[in-house]
Amino acid sequence: MSKAIIVADLKYKSPKRRGRGTGHKGLHSTLKYVQYREDHNAKASAEKLRDRWQDRGLGAHYREIFEACDRLKSKHVLAWTWVVSPAPDLMALVPETRRRDLVMDVTERVVEAYYEARGYQTPPYSYVLHDRLTDEGEQQLHTHVILPGLAP
C-alpha cells in the first residue's frame, strides 16, 4: 500500500447552526482558534499570532476573513476549510530553514492547481501555517486554508 505524500482535508462550514462547530458561530470560533493557536516550540505573543495569516484576497485577520466569508457565502456553504499537511517523514528530509517556506509554497500550488484543473479562476483565500508534533514526536508543519462559500 502506498503512503500519501501530502494529505489534504477538505470540509465546509454550513451557514446553518446544526450543533457544535457549525454555522456562523462555528466558523468564527474556528478562525479565531486557527489564528491564535501556538506552535509546539514557541510561546508567541498575541501580537505575533495576530499577523500569521497569509492573505490571498480574503483577509489577514480572523474577523476580516469571517466578514468576507459571510459576504461571499452560498446558500449551503459559508466557508470551505482545507488542511494541507505534507508527510512529516518526508519533510524531515528538507533542511529545517526551508521547511516553512516549502509548506507555504506547496499550499499555494495545491489551491491554484485545484481550481486550474477544473477550469476556474482561483478564488480569494487566506491560510495560516501551524507547527505541531505528531504522537511520534515528529514535526508536522501544516496549513489551514479558508475559502468563501461561493468558491466552486
Where are the predicted features?
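N-terminal nicking endonuclease/strand-transfer module with a His-rich metal-binding environment
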Residues: 1-152
